[in-house]
Swiss-Prot record:
Binding site for ATP: 10-18, 38, 119
Protein encoded by which gene: argG
Protein name from the UniProt record: Argininosuccinate synthase
Keywords: Amino-acid biosynthesis, Arginine biosynthesis, ATP-binding, Cytoplasm, Ligase, Nucleotide-binding
Location within or outside the cell: Cytoplasm
Length: 400
């Protein structure tokens, strides 16, 4: 008896997920494999991917256009949370995984499958994200991960696929592993595994080299409504179009590259290269607008929430009770985060140069040092006395 009767496989069209189809059937006795490819704005032609799955042995090949949900339900909440894993990575790949898990579970329930499968290895973070998310959404479904068990090298995997007519898309001149969606690109493997190696310019696609960027700065104004980006230069944009336009605008000035040593959930460090122009600038602008519209105590407390939020999303806990609790806090903080942020783009830098809001807590008459100053300077003495009282008492006791 096989490990499952009918399986829905997360499918990308790459060699690993393509090899999973015959492997599940031949080695694990699965009777039927249905593939599901998610259109996350990666730009691939999905019809050839669908056809490749069928040629590889899938009984049915599904394609789901989830771009709008990806931005509205996953990316935008992350912007409200100022989510940057280890203060650098805006979680472009990590945010896609719970959405893919959701549509996998929905497809499994619709087609009567008893298992879900993916092509993740035992070394990465995605296996955790898929397994935990799918289990949270439907604990009754089995999770199959052939690449975690088959023990084949990259070369052996390619050779196995060739026995079933599956060609390898990887060329010797391009050895990198790339994941792409609307939020950006992640690039790893090959020579990049040496952390002292400078990434070659050829790996970048969304961001221009500094030498090729305009010699004049460009100013853009990003409008937010309750923490959600809604306009560019005063023009309302739907979520997908807003991300696409910002990726182009920001990337053309060389902004959006990340080269970092990342602490993976599975306990190892990895060298990761990311391109994420829109997300980086949106988080930077959103955080700046919060500094104008949130009280000091909420702003300071939210920083700790943001770090926890980033960690649990990175670690695959999107559907956890803690994530739901953090969401409730973050949504409450966003009620007054509406306004416009002006950003200067020039030679690889995005600089906030202005911000304004009807909910601004900045009071010019109190902040000024000019003649218009309305701050009661005499009140400071009493405040300082009370504020410093615990320290004064401690000092007196300490000196005996």
């Amino acid at each position: 008896m096989g490990r499952a009767k009918k399986v829905v496989l997360a499918y990308s069209g790459g060699v690993d997920t393509s090899v999973c189809i015959p492997y599940l059937k031949q080695e694990w006795g699965v009777e039927e494999v249905i593939t599901l490819a998610a259109d996350l704005g990666q730009g691939d032609e999905l019809e050839p991917i669908r056809e490749k799955a069928l040629k590889s042995g899938a009984s049915e090949s599904l394609v789901a256009d989830v771009k709008e949900s990806f931005i509205k339900d996953y990316a935008f909440p992350a912007i409200q949370a100022n989510a940057l894993y280890e203060n650098r990575y805006p979680l472009g790949t990590a945010l896609a995984r719970p959405l893919i898990a959701k549509i996998l579970v929905e497809a499994a329930e619709k087609y009567g499958a008893d298992a879900i499968a993916h092509g993740c290895t035992g070394k990465g973070n995605d296996q955790v994200r898929f397994d935990v998310s799918c289990t949270a959404l439907n604990p009754k479904l089995k999770i199959l991960a052939p690449a975690r068990e088959w023990g084949m090298s990259r070369e052996a995997t390619i050779a196995y696929g060739e026995k079933f007519g599956i060609p390898s898309p990887v060329k010797k001149s391009s050895p990198y592993s790339i994941d792409k969606n609307l939020l950006g690109r992640s690039i790893e493997a090959g020579a990049l595994e040496d952390p002292k190696f400078e990434p070659p310019e050829e790996i970048y696609e969304m961001t221009k080299a500094i030498a090729d960027t305009p010699n004049e700065p460009e100013y853009i104004e990003i409008g937010f409504t309750q923490g959600l980006p809604t306009t560019i230069n005063g023009t309302p944009k739907d979520p997908v179009a807003l991300i696409q336009e910002l990726n182009q605008l920001v990337g053309s000035h060389g902004v959006g590259r990340i080269d970092m040593i990342e602490n993976r959930l599975v306990g190892i460090k990895s060298r990761e290269i990311y391109e994420s122009p829109a997300m980086l600038v949106l988080i930077q602008a959103h955080r700046d607008l919060e500094s104008l519209t949130l009280t000091a105590d909420v702003s300071h407390y939210k920083r700790g929430i943001e770090e926890t939020y980033s960690q649990i999303v990175y670690n695959g806990l999107w559907y956890s009770p803690l994530k739901a609790a953090l969401d409730a806090f973050i949504q409450k903080t966003q009620e007054r985060v509406s306004g416009i942020v002006r950003v200067k783009l020039f030679k690889g830098n995005a600089t906030i140069v202005g911000r304004w809001s009807d909910s601004s807590l900045y009071t010019p008459d109190l902040a000024t040092y000019g003649a218009e100053d309305q701050f009661d300077h005499k009140a400071a003495e009493g405040f300082i006395y009370v504020w410093g009282l615990p320290t004064r008492i401690w000092a007196q006791q300490d000196r005996g």
